[in-house]
């Protein structure tokens, strides 16, 4: 049996889930049922959810899953009159002759239930009562399902912008269902553009008022904090985390370390779900900024295209608001005066230190972090040195503080010790690196379990947590687990890392466009590099579109690969415009390989 403080949280979470499920099941119209199996499943689920909302019943340790099922079955028997009334109220005109006979047989079956006795040892043999569930309803378990034929009702913005638990749960359910439709063409019908804009606007107003480093104090004895790493647009990992750990509540705070958008198919969905929770529980949901939440990274990740695929001509406006919202995200948190969390890591001091011959490589402090003007960042966030370091820095095994070959800094265990000691902290939990980043760093943890203990020093530890399971980069899937950290009192400095895998997820098909003359990718590349094939006298360069063989009028738009392993980097002696065009070709080849892999 789990510890009392955990069981209480789990109980509260299950009660809320059961109440919400019962409300949803009660709203289902029987006229939408395709056959008697679905109708029977509806009645069973409704009774299970009603029974599950009974706190006295659930908290009894004798009520195992088997006993709960027995009790539910007995309850169905005792309420057979009510069940029969529901069955007899079914509208037969929607059924064919065979289905009418099936409903008739079901009525007879329910009438005979009063003579049955259900005991724990016999429940496993009740095949007629435990057929596969085929409900057209989302119960919030994050496991997905086949929702391809469902007509989803749009969600509307609540009056006075007061988000409730039911509203946020409904949003998560709708977005989860929409991911199984293999297309985002109807996304705006489910989540209207005005609702998405309202989410971003309301959350931005809350985030703007928060400090660069959010202090999480006042945690009670029965509270805990969940720290989540990179999600990279993988909505189903987020749903899995909520399903396993429970929702945000007064006794359970969530800290998200950034990188909400990425190469996953559902970047906008992940970001909007988190903004909804932030609006509902601003003090118990902390959203930090990641390296993906910058204008430059968003462009490289085709975030604008993702939004325009969903909202068409209204996409650029929402994209602009998301970019502005990114600037409002805090940069770090301190939990119970003991644990520092951030996306990338440590940063250099911007002050002048006369005692140091090389002040640019002095370690920065929490006091300096608080002084960063994060909300006034320019078009290129890379120009803000401290911000760049917070988002991009990485630990390594050598001592000292050094400039990285890419972005940010590299810092050793001695810097971790200095930062913890000077800040009076015991632990650092950062993110930013997954199995792809650690693939060529044999001296560091490989992140295949979703986390790594990188430094252990006298004052404490440095950990990395990554929450996108089965992470893919280019043509490689790392088959890694995702993870999150659970911190509990009294000092929150002994995290328990929970690893998981989400394998059964929908795959979004690449966008099909009707105009084969599209040169969007080529134009974006020319704008980015300042060079193009035209400068070499080539008027018909290779495009990023492929006519489909079964219908030449339908064009497949390839996505730029997240990382290219073959052919790059190019030798330094290759001159422009040849260098940019070679780069373009290698990326195109990688995109084609990626497309082939997803279709085999």
From Swiss-Prot:
GO molecular function: hydrolase activity; metal ion binding
Name assigned to this protein: Serine/threonine-protein phosphatase 7 inactive homolog
Cross-referenced SUPFAM superfamilies: Metallo-dependent phosphatases
Domain of life of the source: Eukaryota
Keywords: Manganese, Metal-binding
Listed GO biological process terms: plastid translation
Co-factor requirement: Mn(2+)
InterPro entries: Calcineurin-like_PHP_ApaH (IPR004843), Metallo-depent_PP-like (IPR029052), PPP_phosphatase (IPR051134), Ser/Thr-sp_prot-phosphatase (IPR006186)
Residues noted as binding Mn(2+) in the record, renumbered to the chain: 230, 232, 343, 432
GO CC annotations on file: cytoplasm; cytosol; nucleus; plastid
Family the entry assigns: Belongs to the PPP phosphatase family. PP-7 subfamily.
Signal peptide region: none
């Amino acid at each position: 049996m789990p510890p009392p403080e955990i069981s209480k949280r789990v109980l509260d979470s299950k009660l809320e889930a059961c109440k919400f499920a019962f409300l949803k099941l009660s709203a289902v119209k029987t006229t939408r049922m395709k056959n008697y199996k679905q109708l029977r499943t509806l009645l069973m689920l409704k009774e299970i959810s009603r029974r599950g909302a009974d706190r006295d019943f659930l908290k009894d340790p004798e009520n195992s899953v088997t006993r709960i099922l027995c009790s539910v079955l007995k309850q169905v028997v005792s309420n057979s009159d009510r069940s029969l009334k529901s069955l007899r109220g079914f509208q037969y005109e929607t059924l064919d002759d065979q289905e009418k006979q099936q409903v008739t047989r079901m009525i007879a079956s329910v009438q005979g239930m009063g003579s049955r006795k259900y005991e724990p040892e016999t429940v496993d043999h009740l095949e007629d009562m435990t057929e596969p569930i085929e409900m057209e309803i989302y119960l919030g378990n994050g496991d997905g399902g086949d929702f391809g034929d469902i007509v989803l009702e749009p969600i509307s913005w609540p009056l006075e912008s007061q988000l409730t638990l039911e509203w946020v749960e409904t949003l998560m359910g709708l977005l989860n269902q929409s991911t199984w439709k293999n297309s985002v063409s109807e996304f705006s019908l489910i989540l209207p553009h005005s609702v998405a804009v309202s989410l971003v606007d309301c959350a931005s107003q809350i985030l703007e008022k928060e400090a660069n480093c959010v202090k999480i104090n006042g945690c009670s004895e029965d509270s805990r904090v969940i720290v989540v790493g990179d999600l990279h647009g993988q909505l189903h990992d987020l749903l899995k985390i909520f399903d396993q750990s429970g929702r945000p509540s007064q006794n359970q705070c969530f800290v998200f370390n950034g990188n909400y958008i990425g190469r996953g198919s559902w970047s906008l969905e992940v970001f909007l779900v988190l903004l909804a929770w932030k609006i509902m529980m601003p003090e118990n949901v902390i959203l930090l900024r990641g390296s993906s939440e910058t204008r430059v990274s968003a462009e490289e990740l085709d975030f604008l295209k993702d939004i325009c695929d969903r909202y068409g001509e209204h996409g650029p406006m929402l994209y602009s608001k998301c970019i502005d919202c990114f600037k409002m995200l805090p940069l770090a948190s301190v939990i119970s005066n003991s644990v520092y969390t951030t996306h990338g890591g440590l940063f250099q001091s911007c002050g002048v230190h006369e005692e140091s011959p090389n002040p640019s490589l002095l370690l920065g402090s929490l006091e300096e972090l608080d002084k960063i003007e994060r909300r006034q960042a320019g078009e290129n966030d890379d120009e803000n040195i401290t911000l760049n370091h917070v988002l991009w820095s990485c630990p390594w095994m050598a001592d000292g503080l050094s400039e990285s070959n890419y972005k940010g800094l590299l810092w050793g265990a001695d810097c971790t010790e200095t930062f913890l000691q000077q800040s009076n902290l015991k632990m650092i939990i950062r993110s930013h690196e997954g199995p792809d980043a650690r693939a060529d760093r044999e001296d560091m943890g490989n992140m295949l379990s979703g986390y790594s203990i990188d430094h252990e020093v006298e004052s404490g530890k440095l950990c990395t947590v990554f929450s996108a399971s089965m992470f893919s980069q280019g043509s490689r899937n790392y088959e890694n687990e995702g993870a999150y950290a659970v911190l509990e009192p009294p000092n929150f400095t002994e995290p328990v890392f929970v690893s998981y895998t989400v394998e059964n997820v929908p795959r979004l098909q690449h966008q099909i466009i009707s105009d084969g003359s599209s040169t969007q990718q080529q134009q974006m590349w020319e704008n980015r590099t300042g060079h193009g094939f035209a400068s070499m006298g080539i008027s018909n360069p290779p495009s990023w579109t492929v006519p489909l063989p079964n219908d030449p009028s339908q064009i497949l738009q390839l996505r730029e690969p997240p990382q290219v392993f073959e052919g790059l980097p190019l030798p330094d002696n290759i001159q422009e415009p040849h260098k940019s065009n070679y780069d373009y070709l290698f990326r195109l080849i990688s995109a084609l390989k990626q497309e082939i892999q997803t279709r085999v």
